[in-house]
């Protein structure tokens, strides 16, 4: 009898819904004997569990100093959008400024989730304070509270769906906040079976077997960064 192998994947909620479904579907069809187990958690939890070897691969959305024993690989860039109900005053402003945004209560991600640290820093650097009244780990929850009128939402742009979110307006916020980066990582020294290489490449096509092997061979963060310095990441 063939023993099913297990791939333990850890990621945060929005990645599970907006970037992984097609990849997972393709993967499980190609490797029907590999049991795919996904955990949804915070970025810090992802990094910590990968560092302990409790999961094979982790995904997270913020630069972190944790997990020094991980091979950390950038996958793609992502942007933020402001979401408001139709008819909201912000929807009529040609180019929103942070000062405009600071006049309203804000609904966004929990601190440490999907680049919320960068959001706080953007306001601070301009001498402003974000009036965050509600936080959640899930973009769908944030959108629900925006529809209720609790506040203005700030979410990952990929989390907005024109078909499902017809009551809301999405306003690009690239000029207000730096782009975020989604990373993938695994514990240094992990033996990567062929199906793990395949999954990594399905999720981030620039992470070829050759590039991943180079990343694994590095001894320092500086060397690891050099592996990816000439690679232009796609934006989602």
Segments (PLM) and residue ranges:
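Beta-alpha-beta core module
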Residues: 67-79, 140-189, 198
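Flexible hinge/capping segments at coil-to-helix
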Residues: 69-106
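Short beta-strand-to-loop elements that line the ligand-binding cleft
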Residues: 34-41, 61, 129-138
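Short beta-strand-centered segments that line the small-molecule binding cleft or hinge
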Residues: 22-26, 43-80, 84, 147-150, ...
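Secondary-structure junction motif
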Residues: 91, 105-126, 192-201, 207-220
């Amino acid at each position: 009898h063939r023993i099913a192998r297990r791939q333990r994947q850890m990621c945060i909620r929005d990645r599970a819904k907006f970037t992984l479904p097609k990849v997972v579907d393709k993967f499980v069809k190609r490797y029907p004997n590999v049991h795919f187990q996904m955990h949804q958690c915070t970025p810090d939890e992802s990094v910590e569990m990968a560092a302990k070897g409790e999961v094979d691969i982790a995904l997270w959305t913020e630069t972190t100093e944790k997990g020094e024993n991980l091979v950390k690989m950038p996958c793609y860039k992502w942007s933020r959008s402001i979401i408001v109900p139709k008819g909201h005053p912000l929807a009529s402003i040609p180019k929103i400024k942070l000062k405009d945004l600071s006049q309203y209560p804000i609904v966004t991600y929990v601190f440490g989730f999907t680049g919320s640290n960068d959001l706080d820093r953007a306001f601070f650097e301009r001498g402003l304070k974000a009036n965050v009244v509600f936080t959640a780990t899930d973009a769908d929850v944030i959108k629900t509270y925006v529809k209720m009128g609790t506040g203005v939402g700030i979410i990952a742009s990929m989390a907005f769906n024109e078909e499902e979110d017809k009551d809301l307006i999405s306003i690009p916020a690239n000029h207000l906040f730096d782009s975020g980066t989604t990373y993938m990582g695994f514990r240094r020294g992990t033996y990567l079976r062929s199906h793990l290489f395949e999954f990594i490449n399905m999720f981030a096509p620039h992470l070829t077997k050759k590039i991943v092997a180079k990343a694994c061979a590095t001894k320092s963060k500086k060397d690891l960064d050099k592996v990816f310095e000439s690679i232009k990441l796609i934006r989602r």
